[in-house]
């Protein structure tokens, strides 16, 4: 059956596919496992417009699940951390593919680069021993727990989003407790015919099942259902600053 699914997907894209390149947002681990099962040739890249646009990539045969490949040859990528393999830090890059600054905006340009000319991406990450890059989240969205642990809401959201009937989520900090705002998959609810009582039980089910997969310091205290999809940027990133 896995081969049949694989062949169906390849044929849907014309029958001749080298590899699928994913980017723009973290890939759900369960989806990655499914891709592996059906032997779909895929990889994940990382970059930004200021890097025209690629900073890290690995071909599907070398790609390590959960990573976004290794720095491209034309760029030097570093982690602003005393221990880039174990302590998360900002991802910074320098190279011929990096922009020189923002047009007619010297203040933004000055803020975007370090004194030694590295672009501050605003993303947080780690390297493994083989040089693969792992994105942990955005520096602006990081939450500091009451006991001093760094919590990356994107990682918590990936777990929440893997739960049945969850379409998307945003994790926020309220009085040092994590609250997951969840928009449910309306089509899945209709297809499975859930009644009102079953829908009312979903928030607690989502919380319990998510917390089983999360470390103690990033446990979710509450799940709240929202009525509308989250507002997005033109790049389809959630405008998380709108949600508290």
Stretches found by the model and what they are:
Residues 1-18, 184-210:
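Alpha-helical "lid/cap" subdomains adjacent to substrate-binding clefts that gate access
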Residues 66-70, 113-116:
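Short Gly/Pro-enriched turn/cap motifs at secondary-structure boundaries
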Residues 1-63, 76, 167:
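Gly/Ser/Thr-rich phosphate-binding loop
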Residues 24, 77, 131, 160, ...:
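Residue-level signal for inorganic ion chemistry
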Residues 98, 132-161, 188-198, 216-220:
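Adenylate-forming
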Residues 124, 162-187, 211:
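C-terminal boundary motif of the adenylate-forming
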Residues 143, 168, 176, 207-244:
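Conserved C-terminal "lid"/linker of ANL adenylate-forming enzymes
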Residues 78, 85-145, 162:
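Conserved ATP-binding/catalytic segment of the ANL
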